[in-house]
From Swiss-Prot:
Its main location: membrane. This is Membrane protein NfeD1b. The lineage of its organism: Bacteria, Bacillati, Bacillota, Bacilli, Bacillales. It is a multi-pass membrane protein. It is found in: Cell membrane. It comes from Bacillus subtilis (strain 168). Keywords: Cell membrane, Membrane, Transmembrane, Transmembrane helix. Signal peptide: none annotated. It comes from the Bacteria. Disulfide bonds: none annotated.
Length: 437
């Protein structure tokens, strides 16, 4: 009997252990790899997308994150924001250089715990430039070189090659970048210098190399709002939007009613602020500052003095810069928009002889003259030619009595004593001119 009970207990133990093994195996099969595309230009819209995607990966309890990188670079501020997000990630991150990680893209790739490259992939050419494509000032370059060096050091990579990507004065001739050239690593050279851990033909191959053969692969996708925000905050689109806005509102000043130019200008402004709000660049306080600026400029029309108008203009410009992802991009955009608007204004006023009709809606332009049929209610034309007696001396103004009515008058120019006869010779509104007779 005891043997039977022991046998049953053994069977039960084996059964429980097999169940536990199934559960452990199921847990292993539930591993998740989260793939986040880092494509096109690096700008604040992409930074916002990365922030949301990293949070989604965390919420999904992902075991690993792969950044699928193919970018020519972009804005330094956005790249630094993205670097901070990657560094703060509690989930291991692998950068997959799927074709190109250039300029700011190379900096982003260096933030990852691991780097793999596709055959033919390239990483580097990370010199910092200004809005016109020229070399940035020394202060900006120094900061950028420090960022590139830190990105390499914190992940145990030789900082020399990161610096050579951003500074042509660094000699890296052993990998094809002598002094005077910026370093761009291909897949083989990246492995040679320890920047890449290997090549992978595609994401599936990479996932296997990372040891997640049975993992579930989830792909982050941009929402419609994120795609729109990225497009509207693109450094090429921003000056176009502001030019349409400024030009449309300028032409509207010469149009009766609310026409197509004004509508187009307002829509362009709305799109500008919507894109920057959705990308996380601007807050509602920025929009309120812009609206306050517009109100102040309208007040300047009714209460001219200059100060209110200048405050309004300052508020509008400040709101645009606060919403901008890059000071340089916004400065260039405003210069372009202002130049086009001023040119249009000169063309309309000097060449075409147009007059601004907008202010006619706000200001009364009717003239009150006798030719237009207006007559003052104080005009005393009925007194013309009448005779009266001076009640006071006229020096040359004084008082006379005409038909028992006391009137304020002025003499023709000479002094006239009291109790003298005078005759009305001219009436101009409320002004009555008399002459002694």
């Amino acid at each position: 009997m005891l043997q039977i009970k022991g046998f049953r207990a053994a069977l039960l133990g084996i059964f429980l252990l097999s169940l536990l093994g199934v559960q452990l195996n199921a847990k292993a099969e539930k591993q998740t790899v989260y793939v986040i595309p880092v494509e096109k230009n690096v700008e604040q819209g992409l930074a916002s997308f990365l922030s949301r995607s990293l949070q989604d990966a965390k919420d999904a309890h992902a075991d690993h994150i792969i950044l699928d990188i193919n970018t020519p670079g972009g804005l330094v501020k956005s790249a630094i924001d993205m670097a901070d997000l990657i560094t703060e990630s509690e989930i291991p991150v692998t950068a997959y250089v799927n074709k190109r990680a250039l300029s700011a893209g190379a900096y982003i790739a260096l933030q990852a715990d691991h780097i793999y490259m596709a055959p033919g992939g390239k990483m580097g050419a990370a010199a910092i430039v200004d809005g016109q494509g020229n070399a940035a000032d020394q202060k900006a370059q120094s900061l950028w070189l420090a960022e590139m060096e830190d990105a390499a050091v914190k992940n145990n990579r030789d900082p020399k090659y990161a610096l050579a990507m951003a500074d042509p004065d660094i000699d890296a001739k052993e990998v094809g970048a002598p002094k005077g050239d910026l370093l761009t690593l291909n897949a083989d050279k990246a492995i040679e210098v320890g920047y890449s851990e290997g090549t992978a033909d595609n994401l599936s191959t990479l996932v296997k190399k990372l040891g997640f053969e049975k993992a579930q692969i989830s792909y982050a996708k941009e929402s419609f709002a994120e795609k729109t925000a990225r497009w509207l905050t693109n450094p090429v689109i921003v000056p176009i939007l502001l030019t349409i806005a400024f030009l449309g509102l300028t032409v509207e000043l010469f149009s009766p009613g609310v026409g197509l130019p004004g509508t187009a200008g307002l829509i362009a402004l709305l799109l500008f602020f919507y894109g920057h709000l959705a990308a996380g660049l601007a807050g509602y306080e920025t929009v309120l500052l812009f609206i306050a600026g517009v109100i102040l400029i309208l007040l300047e029309i009714f209460l001219p003095g200059g100060i209110i108008g200048l405050l309004g203009l300052g508020a509008i410009i400040a709101s645009l810069f606060l919403a901008a992802g890059s000071f340089t991009v916004m400065a260039v955009s405003l210069l372009i928009a202002s130049a086009v608007s001023i040119t249009a204004f000169i063309l309309l006023t000097r060449v075409l002889g147009k007059r601004m009709k907008f202010f006619k809606k706000l200001i009364l332009n009717d003239s009150t003259n006798t030719e237009s049929g207006y007559v003052s209610n104080q005009t005393r034309t009925d007194l013309m030619g009448k005779v009266g007696i001076t009640f006071t001396p006229l020096r040359p103004s004084g008082t006379v009595i005409i038909d028992d009515e006391r009137l304020d008058v002025v003499s023709e120019g000479s002094f006239t004593e009291k109790d003298k006869k005078v005759k009305v010779i001219k009436v101009e509104g409320s002004r009555i001119v008399v002459r002694e007779i």
